[in-house]
Amino acid sequence: MRGHIVVFARAPALGTGKRRLARDIGDLAALRFERQMLARLLRRLGRDRRWHLRLTVTPDHARHRKHLWPRAIQICGQGRGDLGQRMRRALAACPPGPALLIGTDIPALGPGHIAEAFRLLGRYDVVFGPAVDGGFWLVGARRSSCLPPLFGKVRWSGPHALADVLANLPPHVSVGFAPRLEDVDDGGSFHRLATHRGF
């Protein structure tokens, strides 16, 4: 059974996304980075036949802006609610079986990381990709149709996000961890990773 990947993204538009990064490097540079990272991620993961890729975007109406997205990828809106509600809904909308949800701001992310996360779901109920800043770059569930409680009372965009999500899990839920990666949220991480990743 092929796994499913939900790419969780904001439609690239000047002044709307990556606000902390834009404060440090400017709106135009942040927009350029956002577009480049999304295109790179979809190119890296979208052609791999080991999984099915779905792009879930906000705002919802952006899914109709065909010039923004590759033609061969399924696109849907994130819908209403806070970040946790939208993430849970996106995972639950996947067909039965293993499903992963990822963001678009992890320059190192490649097919090997995704394959490893799906392997972990062969042994664990849920899997997380910890981020250097205390958040997470990936969350996945062995059975998308039967998600445990994950996203209630989470302090998003801070050093406690992953710890808060883990604290929500019932004791019987087994947890695996993918490698720790760094996401780009501000000028410091942008300049640190740009040296190695060429964006």
Which ranges hold each PLM region?
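N-terminal nucleotide-binding beta1-loop-alpha1 segment
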Residues: 1-21
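A short, N-terminal amphipathic alpha-helix
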Residues: 32-51
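Short beta-strand/loop segment that forms part of the nucleotide-sugar
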Residues: 51-59
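Short phosphate-binding loop-to-helix
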Residues: 65-98, 158
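Short aromatic-hydrophobic micro-motifs that form the base-stacking/packing surface
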Residues: 100-102
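Conserved donor-nucleotide/metal-binding helix-loop-beta segment in metal-dependent transferases, i.e.
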Residues: 109-135
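Short, glycine-/small-residue-rich phosphate/pyrophosphate-handling segment
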Residues: 145-166
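Conserved alpha/beta core of the MobA/IspD/sugar-nucleotide pyrophosphorylase nucleotidyltransferase superfamily
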Residues: 163-199
